Structure formats: C-alpha cells, structure tokens
Amino acid sequence: MAKPTRKRRVKKNIESGIAHIHATFNNTIVMITDVHGNAVAWSSAGALGFKGSRKSTPFAAQMASEAAAKSAQEHGLKTVEVTVKGPGSGRESAIRALAAAGLEVTAIRDVTPVPHNGARPPKRRRV
C-alpha cells in the first residue's frame, strides 16, 4: 500500500504579527498569528511537557512564549503586538519572554472578557 503523503510546511514570510496570550488559572497558551489572524506558530505550557499545577506557573508561561517566538522567527517575524486574555499568573512573564526572545513588542492590549453580569459564577471552593 502506498505511503500517505504529508503536506509540507510552507515557510511564511511575515514581518509583523499578533501574539495572543491566553492565561488561564490552569495553563498558558501562546499563539502567534499574522495581522489577518492566520496562525503562524503556537505553544502552551502543557505542550512543553509541564503537567498538573506546574502548567500554571510563570516559568511555564515563559517557556511557552519562548518556544512560540522561536518558531515564529523562523517564518521571518520581527515585530509583534501582544493581546493578553485571562487572569492567569503567566501574563507578565509571557510578555517579557517574547521581548527577550528577540521580537519587538509594539503594543500590549488586554482583551480579557468582562461580563455585564452574565452567567452565574461557580460556587466558592471550600478547602
């Protein structure tokens, strides 16, 4: 039987893009897109091998940002706008890691959704 042919990754030449940082209480996901919203690179704390409560640490967010930035730079990315969503602990360290990886951060936007008193929140935890 013939081997199924895999699609080859096409190297995109993009100068500027948008880095979407989704920081939840349990994980941090970093996705880098072009200005139209097409994904260029992504990474998350869980994808890097962090398990359980270690995924929610600032260090895990930093490593996820560095991994996403590295693979985005292979596509020619130089400048990036940052949008941050969520209340997680990895927000600040993820932005710093993007800048430290060699990407020029031009803008930082907080796009955390705030309800106008929508759904009822879950009950308080009793530990």
Curated annotation (Swiss-Prot):
Alphabetically ordered keywords of this record: Ribonucleoprotein, Ribosomal protein, RNA-binding, rRNA-binding
Entry superkingdom: Bacteria
MF annotations from Gene Ontology: rRNA binding; structural constituent of ribosome
A GO cellular component annotation in the UniProt record: ribosome
Protein's GO biological process: translation
InterPro entries, per the entry: Ribosomal_uS11, Ribosomal_uS11_bac-type, Ribosomal_uS11_CS, Ribosomal_uS11_sf
Quaternary structure and interacting proteins, as annotated: Part of the 30S ribosomal subunit. Interacts with proteins S7 and S18. Binds to IF-3.
Family statement: Belongs to the universal ribosomal protein uS11 family.
Biological role: Located on the platform of the 30S subunit, it bridges several disparate RNA helices of the 16S rRNA. Forms part of the Shine-Dalgarno cleft in the 70S ribosome.
Protein name per the record: Small ribosomal subunit protein uS11
